[in-house]
């Protein structure tokens, strides 16, 4: 909320995010340990990072109805090769690529998903790192880079050390991190950023017609909104 408010409230956002990071109750997944875990024990939901999640027995079946065709072999939510190149920049070591199988998302539908109890993450530790990094981006770019680096080390071994952080770098991690969680639209809206498509040419330009809901006709007529 503070991050969306902007201005001096950004300082509150980064302070509270780092309080969660430093509290010791949550931990980022270990990349090497996750990579070397057999398929039956892979936790694609990153459960240890969940600060708050919604649980329900129908998460898997509901996700199957959205993320893949029950009667076919292909998914109806596809990651085109062009989008993968834009998103991962050729980094095939990123553990989050395990969320995709045969072009559909298996984040919530993998065979072992019920082992970790069906759930939908609402707030995760990784989000705290991204909030803190964005909050420090202008005032202390080196610290922001350290935060982003720590998160990336939990996701891939292909790390390039950076001394600074840009909005585009943070947005790129958000796009990789929030797959299937319904967050990205609101990130694009908050930043008034173009929505990225499968290629750099087929996205949606940021505008009020995309991000601002029109007033109902009754509100205009009876609410003195002209």
For each of these PLM feature ranges, what is it?
Residues 1-68, 74-79, 84-226:
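Acidic/polar-rich alpha-helix caps and helix-coil junctions
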């Amino acid at each position: 909320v503070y991050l969306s408010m902007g201005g001096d409230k950004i300082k509150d956002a980064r302070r509270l995010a780092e309080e969660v990071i430093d509290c010791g109750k949550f931990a980022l997944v270990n990349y090497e340990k996750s990579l070397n875990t057999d398929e039956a024990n892979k936790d694609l939901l990153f459960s240890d990072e969940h600060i708050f999640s919604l649980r329900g027995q129908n998460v898997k079946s509901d996700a199957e109805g959205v993320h893949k065709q029950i009667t076919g072999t292909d998914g109806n939510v596809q990651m085109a090769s062009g989008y993968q190149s834009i998103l991962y920049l050729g980094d095939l070591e990123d553990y989050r690529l395990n969320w995709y199988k045969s072009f559909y998302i298996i984040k919530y539908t993998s065979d072992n998903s019920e082992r970790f109890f069906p759930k939908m993450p609402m707030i995760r530790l990784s989000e705290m790192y991204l909030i803190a990094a964005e909050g420090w981006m202008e005032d202390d770019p080196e610290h922001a880079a350290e935060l982003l680096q720590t998160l990336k080390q939990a996701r891939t071994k292909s790390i390039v050390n950076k001394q600074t952080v840009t909005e585009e770098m943070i947005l790129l991690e958000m796009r990789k991190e929030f797959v299937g969680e319904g967050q990205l639209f609101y990130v694009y809206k908050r930043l008034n950023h173009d929505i990225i498509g499968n290629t750099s040419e087929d996205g949606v330009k940021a505008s009020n017609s995309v991000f601002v809901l029109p007033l109902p006709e009754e509100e205009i007529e009876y609410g003195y909104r002209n």
